[in-house]
Amino acid sequence: MKAILNILLTGIIQLGVTHFVYAQSTLDNIHSTGIFRIGTEGAYAPFSYHDASGKLTGFDVEIGREIAQRMKAKPEFIEGKWDGLIGGLDAGRFDAVMNQIAITPEREKKYSFSLPYVISEAVLITQKDNNDIKTFSDLKGKKSAHTLTNNFAQIARHYGADIIGTNGFNQEVDLVSTGRADATINDKLSYLDYKKHRPDAPVKIVAADTRAAQTAVLLRKNDTELKTAVDKAITEIKADGTYQRIWDKYFAENN
């Protein structure tokens, strides 16, 4: 009986130690492996996408590389669809997610965020000839194109829109431009980049949410040491001019 009790106690202690290591040592794992695993979409220009040569690039990707460098690690970008990125963080496939993840009260209940590295606003996009939708309130009963779990879809639902599920921004705007969706709500910077590359696309902005959305690195709630390290890196990037250089590369024409 005593032997059985000792075995049980040993198992409980080992389980507790394993859980403690998993919950507390993400930064230690990054330091020991030299790899910072970042989940990203790879299909959301200009933040995370593939250039003409097939190389993964974008504003978020370049900021992620700089963060990793300042943590003395190599970034490993693991691509996936938007709807699976947060689940991938939960499952431990990534150490962080960088894909224009907006800070929201709902997400803050379960996750941790770094200091914000982008501040933008949500815009309502319709087909160029659409005169029925002029404000967010006009979305009631209309079809709005979104990835199902992002914060823009939540805004559209709030105004009574029927959601058409998509795989990302380009599909959303294409659905609007071809009339298969009435509208989409999305990030202003993404829209401006889209129009820069496709100036003849028959879409327009009809309204903007002036409450700026803050974008940050998404982390697990218990990764406090990693958050401190990422925040330190972001602060350094902004202080030494690196952030402004990357910003100007992607958004100078939009200023």
Please provide the spans of the model-predicted regions:
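Extracytoplasmic small-molecule ligand-binding "clamshell" domains
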Residues: 25-100
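A structural signal for short loop-to-beta-strand junctions that line the ligand-binding cleft
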Residues: 27, 59-60, 107-118, 203-208, ...
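Ligand-binding cleft/hinge of the Venus flytrap
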Residues: 48-52, 64-73, 136, 140, ...
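Short helix-initiation/N-cap motifs at beta->coil->alpha
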Residues: 77-87, 131, 148-150, 164-178, ...
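A ligand-binding cleft/hinge motif common to bilobed small-molecule-binding domains
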Residues: 87, 101-109, 155-158, 182-211
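Periplasmic-binding protein-like
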Residues: 119-126, 188, 192-235, 251-255
